[in-house]
């Protein structure tokens, strides 16, 4: 697209309040087509990226043996070349799918339609049932069998153990009661490795058993959900990174070098709720599926003032200054030569949402950002701007002794917000943290997920009827998960997927520039789906400065 990329920016008026500035500003073209390529898609940052470039699902799960994750690749380095796409091309792609999708649709029908109660996931309440406790003294054999049956009813189990077979974590049940099960898992892994093979997954009788080995730990998921083995492996990697965020990779390796059968639960005692919360977030928050962060919808003028205030309220030791609201990003300012990885940001989201104690004052806690640097700790200053709001300020420092200097940054940031009139605008934005899909103006559109790959950000509307129950919301996310797994299948990735079902139609379109997943009325046609894409992309382009951070700032 040959259109200029600048947008309206904001500045302070004479009285210090927000005022738009139109000088130097040329709007992007309203239409995102033709010639849409990476860096030109709706939501693409105009002045560099905030995150390590994670162009695809595969980039998020690459081995730590790759390049240093704290450094962003140079423009044009690595990855596939940008793909130019336009509406004629997508129309042609979908026309050609009529034959190609015959087999795919059959698979989708078999795997996505509700089956028997044995196959269909449990209700959300059951899925988050507290872990089964070991039987009390004097409990009868019937009680033990009932507890075991309750444990087996869960749709997904997660286990973490050491290479010596010592239990570290289990999603349900006690580690002691499951130690023999974990021992069998380690024996299976070791047996195959003796023949120089590596076990990745087992598929049998509707179950998937997925293994991820990150020495000195082995992580295992046992699931009868519609998630692919690849996505289950991604969840296990998140759990591994969660453990590293508490210990650091260097400390973890040192512990097991000294004592191979060390019981890691001693060090992780009390952190189970953080891992539990991470699993719950991954079950309902599409941020993890998309490998991206979602921004709080906010007027560009307000966001610019918030970012500038963060930039100016800094200390020498600060690396990242982040303002969050309900697991949505409001603003992020980084040191000029450092980039955050989406996985590290998700782990910070999880840390904050897993504890209400951060609302009680200013916290100063060590935290490892494993994709940035797994060898050491940063220190994070965490505080809510006000106890009755969801605005949480996160200041990441390299100096453990710098609490008071970083705390003063918080004070100066709040002063600047009030002086510029942005504080009240933020509180008002929190009243409507999500937008309605009706604003898009596509009658049959029910919901969508859109990710800009170059910015590492995504947007989606509020989930509304007919998905207003928790069970239906989890079902919708399950449909997106399935489309995502087909689009990113390691052996046969699909660029476009079109599915028609009894309850909704689904569409996926994955390019080098963006990913789009749409859900709309089952009465729609393939032609209307293509038309809906065009309207939706035009709307996202029009609203991009409210839905994305287009001009990220640095110190």
From Swiss-Prot:
Residues covered by region (Disordered): 1-90, 112-149
Positions of modified residues (Phosphoserine): 31, 56, 91
Cellular component annotations (GO), alphabetically ordered: Mon1-Ccz1 complex
Keyword match DNA repair: no
InterPro entries: FUZ/MON1/HPS1_longin_1 (IPR043972), FUZ/MON1/HPS1_longin_2 (IPR043971), FUZ/MON1/HPS1_longin_3 (IPR043970), Mon1 (IPR004353)
UniProt modified residues of type Phosphothreonine: 61
Record keywords, A-Z: Guanine-nucleotide releasing factor, Phosphoprotein
Skewed-composition ranges (Basic and acidic residues): 1-12, 130-139
Keyword Phosphoprotein assigned: yes
GO MF annotation terms: guanyl-nucleotide exchange factor activity
Gene Ontology BP annotations: protein secretion; protein targeting to vacuole; vesicle-mediated transport
Complex formation: Interacts with CCZ1. Found in a complex with RMC1, CCZ1, MON1A and MON1B. The MON1A-CCZ1B complex interacts with RIMOC1. The MON1A-CCZ1B complex interacts with RAB7A and this interaction is enhanced in the presence of RIMOC1.
PANTHER family documented for this protein: SAND PROTEIN-RELATED, VACUOLAR FUSION PROTEIN MON1 HOMOLOG A
Protein family according to the UniProt entry: Belongs to the MON1/SAND family.
Function (record text): Plays an important role in membrane trafficking through the secretory apparatus. Not involved in endocytic trafficking to lysosomes. Acts in concert with CCZ1, as a guanine exchange factor (GEF) for RAB7, promotes the exchange of GDP to GTP, converting it from an inactive GDP-bound form into an active GTP-bound form.
Protein name: Vacuolar fusion protein MON1 homolog A
Originating organism: Bos taurus
Gene name tied to this protein: MON1A
């Amino acid at each position: 697209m040959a259109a200029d990329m600048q947008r309206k920016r904001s500045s302070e008026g004479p009285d210090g309040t927000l005022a738009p500035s139109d000088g130097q500003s040329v709007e992007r073209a309203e239409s995102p087509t033709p010639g849409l390529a990476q860096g030109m898609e709706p939501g693409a940052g105009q002045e560099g990226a905030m995150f390590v470039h994670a162009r695809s699902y595969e980039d998020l799960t690459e081995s730590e043996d790759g390049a240093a994750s704290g450094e962003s690749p140079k423009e044009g380095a690595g990855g596939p070349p940008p793909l130019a796409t336009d509406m004629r091309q997508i129309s042609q792609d979908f026309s050609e799918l009529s034959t190609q999708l015959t087999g795919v649709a059959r698979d989708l029908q078999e795997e996505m339609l509700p089956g028997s109660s044995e196959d269909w996931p449990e209700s959300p309440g059951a899925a988050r049932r507290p872990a089964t406790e070991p039987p009390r003294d004097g409990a009868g054999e019937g009680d033990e069998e009932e507890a075991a049956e309750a444990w087996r009813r869960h749709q997904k189990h997660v286990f973490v153990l050491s290479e010596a077979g010592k239990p570290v974590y289990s999603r349900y049940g006690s580690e002691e009661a499951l130690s023999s099960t974990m021992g069998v898992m380690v024996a299976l892994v070791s047996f195959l490795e003796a023949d120089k093979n590596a076990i990745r997954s087992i598929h049998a009788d509707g179950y998937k058993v997925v293994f991820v080995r990150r020495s000195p730990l082995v992580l295992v998921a046992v699931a009868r959900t519609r998630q692919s083995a690849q996505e289950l492996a991604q969840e296990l990697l998140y759990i591994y990174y969660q453990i590293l965020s508490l210990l650091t990779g260097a400390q973890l390796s040192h512990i097991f070098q000294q004592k191979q059968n060390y019981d890691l639960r001693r060090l992780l005692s009390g952190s189970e709720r953080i891992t539990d919360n991470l699993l719950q977030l991954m079950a309902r928050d599409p941020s993890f599926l998309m490998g991206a962060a979602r921004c709080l919808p906010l007027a560009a003028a307000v966001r610019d003032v918030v970012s500038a205030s963060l930039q100016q309220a800094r200390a020498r030791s600060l690396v990242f200054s982040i303002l969050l609201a309900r697991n949505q990003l409001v603003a992020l300012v980084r040191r000029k030569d450092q980039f955050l990885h989406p996985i590290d940001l998700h782990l910070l989201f999880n840390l904050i949402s897993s504890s209400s104690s951060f609302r009680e004052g200013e916290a100063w806690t060590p935290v490892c950002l494993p994709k940035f640097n797994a060898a050491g700790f940063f220190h994070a200053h965490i505080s809510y701007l006000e106890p009755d709001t969801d605005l949480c300020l996160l200041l990441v420092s390299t100096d453990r002794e710098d609490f008071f200097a970083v705390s003063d940054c918080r004070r100066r940031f709040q002063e600047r917000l009030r002086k510029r009139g942005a504080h009240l605008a933020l509180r008002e934005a929190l009243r409507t943290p999500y937008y309605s899909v009706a604003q898009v103006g596509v009658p049959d559109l029910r919901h969508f997920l859109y990710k800009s790959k170059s910015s590492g950000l995504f947007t989606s509307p509020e989930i509304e009827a007919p998905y207003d129950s928790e069970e239906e919301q989890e079902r919708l996310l399950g449909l997106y998960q399935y489309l995502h797994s087909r689009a990113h299948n390691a052996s046969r990735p699909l660029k476009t997927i079109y599915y028609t079902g009894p309850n909704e139609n689904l569409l996926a379109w994955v390019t080098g520039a963006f990913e789009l997943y749409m859900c709309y009325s089952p009465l729609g046609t393939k032609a209307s789906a293509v038309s809906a894409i065009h309207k939706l992309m035009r709307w996202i382009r029009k609203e991009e400065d409210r839905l994305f951070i287009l001009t990220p700032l640095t110190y």
